[in-house]
């Protein structure tokens, strides 16, 4: 009984006093849930007999204090709310610079693949020449490939000097660095091709602005001959094309071509206009005026022959790359257009050049209307025809009979403020209204 009373008193003191005053190991009879059993030690012999079944334990906490003193404590303030920080911009991935050995290996692979492709093109070109010697006709695609291969082979002629002259091959990397255009087309990468096309497009846009101003100025000169209305319509149409990016139609170009029948010829163009046309067709604008005219004339002849081949084979057989190349050769936009838009502008060119017989110089200047900084509008699908509901003829006859018997006096009252053309119309309408009112009164 005394042992039980001692354990109860110690338990009550422990829950109300600090853990520093009374420790658990003073009496093994007191047990707590927060104790951890330590099986490494044997039970002490000095303990009482009733506690023989209890193994010694160590407290899992250093202190055991009552929570009563914490009840009156003020609540902790909430953490200050910070505004959400804006998301950090994504950093561009850092380009790891290749070592010297890797760059040398990449250049060796690049030249190996270039010579390999050139050898394949040479074999294919030899077969095409054999077919030509036997009287066969090449397609447009085969003809262009043969011409490209021949141009690549002629580009290798200057490099023979580096092979013939002793120790001059060490200057070959310097020569290629200074004149990269001397290499054949098989050595050109896709990134360099895209960069070159974008630069040419930027130059064409500048030339297109100048040519648009030239066309407007020529139209003002012919204002007295053609009339102010036609010139004003043309000026407004040019402004519309510049502002909205709308593609000019074939009918509009043919209609406005009458304003420039006499002036838009290669003989009447000035040097600035000749230079702009050469840059539009990707020709070197170097030389005298006669040389520039000769270059343009020869280019227009080759374009006409190419147009005849395209019209014979069909625009649908051309790939996207061929459509873009053909558009660039004719001074038209090639980037930023879908395949359908490329085909549409190529068909329009063929119609104007072959069917409408528009002068080549005017045709080139009309391409300046296509080269705008705005993105061209997509081709809109044809609107579906609205079906007209069928009307019963009996209902139509009944409505017409009601209209004949109706009184027209309210209609005439609403027209008091309008100016009538002549007094005879008023008299006739008044007579008809009287007759109609009499008929309605008689019940006819």
From Swiss-Prot:
Keyword Iron attached: no
Pfam family, one: LETM1_RBD
Keywords: Membrane, Mitochondrion, Mitochondrion inner membrane, Transit peptide, Transmembrane, Transmembrane helix
Subcellular location: Mitochondrion inner membrane
Bilayer topology term: Single-pass membrane protein
Broad class of where this protein is predominantly found: mitochondrion
Keyword Transit peptide attached: yes
One Gene Ontology cellular component: mitochondrial inner membrane
Regions of this protein lying in the Mitochondrial matrix compartment: 177-444
Transit peptide: 1-24
Residue ranges of the TM segments: 156-176
Segments forming domain Letm1 RBD: 199-417
Residue ranges annotated as Mitochondrial intermembrane topological domain: 25-155
Protein name stated in the entry: LETM1 domain-containing protein LETM2, mitochondrial
Gene of this entry: letm2
């Amino acid at each position: 009984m005394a042992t039980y009373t001692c354990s109860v008193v110690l338990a009550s003191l422990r829950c109300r006093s600090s853990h520093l005053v009374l420790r658990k190991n003073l009496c093994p009879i007191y047990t707590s849930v927060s104790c951890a059993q330590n099986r490494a030690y044997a039970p002490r012999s000095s303990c009482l007999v009733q506690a023989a079944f209890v193994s010694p334990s160590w407290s899992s906490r250093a202190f055991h204090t009552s929570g009563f003193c914490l009840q009156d404590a003020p609540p902790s303030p909430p953490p200050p709310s910070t505004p959400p920080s804006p998301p950090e911009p994504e950093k561009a991935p850092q380009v790891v610079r290749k070592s010297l050995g890797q760059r040398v290996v990449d250049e060796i692979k690049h030249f190996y693949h270039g010579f390999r492709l050139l050898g394949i093109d040479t074999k294919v070109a030899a077969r095409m020449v054999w077919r030509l010697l036997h009287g066969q006709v090449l397609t447009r695609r085969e003809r262009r490939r043969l011409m490209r291969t021949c141009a690549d082979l002629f580009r290798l002629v200057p490099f023979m000097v580096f092979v013939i002259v002793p120790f001059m091959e060490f200057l070959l990397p310097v020569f290629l660095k200074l004149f990269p255009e001397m290499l054949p087309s098989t050595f050109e990468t896709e990134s360099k091709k895209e960069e070159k096309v974008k630069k040419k497009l930027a130059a064409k846009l500048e030339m297109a602005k100048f040519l648009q101003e030239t066309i407007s100025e020529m139209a003002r000169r012919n204002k007295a001959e053609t009339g102010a209305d036609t010139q004003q319509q043309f000026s407004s149409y040019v402004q519309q094309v510049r502002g909205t990016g709308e593609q000019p139609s074939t009918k509009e170009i043919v209609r406005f071509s009458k304003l420039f029948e006499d002036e838009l010829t290669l003989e009447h163009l000035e040097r600035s206009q000749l230079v702009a046309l050469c840059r539009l067709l990707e020709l070197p604008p170097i030389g005298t005026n006669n040389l520039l005219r000769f270059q343009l004339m020869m280019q227009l002849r080759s374009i006409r022959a190419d147009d005849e081949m395209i019209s014979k084979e069909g625009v649908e057989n051309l790939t996207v790359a061929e459509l873009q190349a053909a558009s660039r050769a004719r001074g038209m936009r090639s980037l930023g257009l879908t395949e359908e838009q490329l085909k549409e502008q190529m068909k329009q060119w063929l119609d104007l050049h072959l069917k409408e017989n528009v002068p080549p110089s005017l045709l080139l200047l009309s391409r300046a209307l296509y080269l705008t900084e705005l993105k061209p509008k997509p081709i809109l699908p044809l609107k579906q025809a609205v079906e007209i509901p069928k009307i019963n003829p009996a209902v139509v006859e009944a409505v017409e009979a009601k209209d004949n018997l109706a009184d027209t006096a309210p209609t005439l009252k609403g027209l008091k403020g309008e100016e009538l053309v002549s007094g005879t119309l008023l008299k006739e309408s008044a007579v008809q209204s009287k007759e109609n009112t009499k008929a309605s009164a008689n019940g006819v």
